[in-house]
A protein has these predicted regions:
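Active-site histidine-anchored catalytic micro-motif
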Residues: 91-156, 261-262
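Short active-site oxyanion
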Residues: 90-92, 166-170
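Aromatic-lined glycan-binding groove of carbohydrate-active enzymes
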Residues: 166-168, 175-180, 217-221
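Catalytic cores of soluble, metal-dependent hydrolases
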Residues: 4-14, 20-93, 105, 111, ...
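Solvent-exposed alpha-helices and their adjacent loops that cap or buttress functional pockets
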Residues: 2-3, 111-113, 135-137, 158-164, ...
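Active-site metal-binding loops of divalent metal-dependent hydrolases
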Residues: 14, 98-99, 123, 174-175, ...
């Protein structure tokens, strides 16, 4: 395990932050793919926190941000629950849901970790703002909110932002960036390992560098893993597929190295969309990846 003994599973069946519906069914698909059986085989003590209550759909609108009020309510409640889990000295394992739930996850973590390292495994940087976002979908702004880039009502969720520091953040698997995101990454000091970097350096060297960055002067390390970081041939069940992603073995190897480091203190897996999947392939893959993070070995 990492720095705690018990894993607390928290399902967040929420998909309002994404451009298409279906990721709200992700947690159940992951459970249906055998998550509890896999964790039992690893002999890991698990506390199932059950699904977080998802807000009703409001009629209110925001001129640029879709489902703004629902996302505020959801992430406020999620932050409180994650904080409660950490206070019990348990390992929060959050299952999404779309990537907008990261806002609540790290808002809860920030109430306990004042210098949090973040590994953001994603095809995208999720650093857009309401002004730069082409779509208005908040799942593309979730990391930006933690850096104070975003509407006050989002960044001011208790602990939400700015509670992350650019120098403590590593992006891995990136292969689609909007112009404003490129500019911010270059100017802010965030370390970004694109697919080009992974191809050139290999995942072993990338992870060595990444772990060095996120553990330098930090008091905890959070993994935010978007399943669209993988190549769509491996993980078809996700809403924003970008060709040329992380391979099956590269992903497993990265998570195995994170386990070996014993430095990861929390994790979330997001953007599994069973309505776009092929026979629950992506959910099964997610179960396997979670197992690698928590100690599954070939031998």
């Amino acid at each position: 395990m990492m720095m705690t003994e018990t894993v607390s599973l928290l399902s967040v069946p929420f998909g309002y932050g994404a451009g298409r519906h279906g990721s709200e069914m992700g947690p159940q698909a992951i459970f249906n793919a055998g998550l509890m059986r896999q964790l039992s085989e690893l002999q890991i003590p698990v506390q199932d926190e059950g699904p977080l209550t998802v807000p009703q759909h409001y009629n209110s609108t925001h001129p640029r941000l879709k489902y703004f009020h629902e996302i505020i309510e959801l992430n406020t409640n999620l932050a409180a629950k994650v904080s409660e889990i950490v206070a019990r000295n348990s390992f929060p394992l959050v299952l999404g849901g779309d990537h907008s739930i990261a806002i609540g996850t790290y808002a809860g973590l920030a109430q306990h970790y004042k210098n949090l390292g973040v590994i953001w495994f994603d095809a995208h940087a999720d650093l857009n703002t309401e002004d730069s976002s082409p779509s208005g979908n908040i799942h593309g702004m979730s990391l930006g909110v933690g850096l104070g880039r975003g509407p006050d009502l989002l960044t001011q969720i208790k602990g939400a932002g700015p509670n992350l520091k650019p120098e403590n953040i590593v992006l891995i698997g990136t292969r689609q960036l909007d112009a404003g995101e490129k500019e911010y990454i270059r100017s802010s000091g965030i370390k970004c390992f694109t697919m080009h970097d992974i191809d050139r350096k290999g995942m072993s060297n990338v992870m060595d560098e990444a772990m060095s960055i996120v553990t330098r002067g930090t008091d905890g390390v959070h993994l935010s893993f978007d399943i669209d970081s993988l190549d769509p041939l491996e993980a078809p069940g996700t809403g924003t597929k970008i060709p040329g992603g992380v391979s099956y073995r590269e992903a497993h190897f990265a998570l195995e190295l994170m386990y070996e480091s014993r430095k990861i203190t929390s994790a979330e897996f997001v953007e599994v969309n069973p309505s776009l999947d092929a026979g629950n392939k992506t959910a099964r893959l997610t179960v396997e990846l979670i197992a690698s993070l928590l100690g599954q070995r070939i031998l």
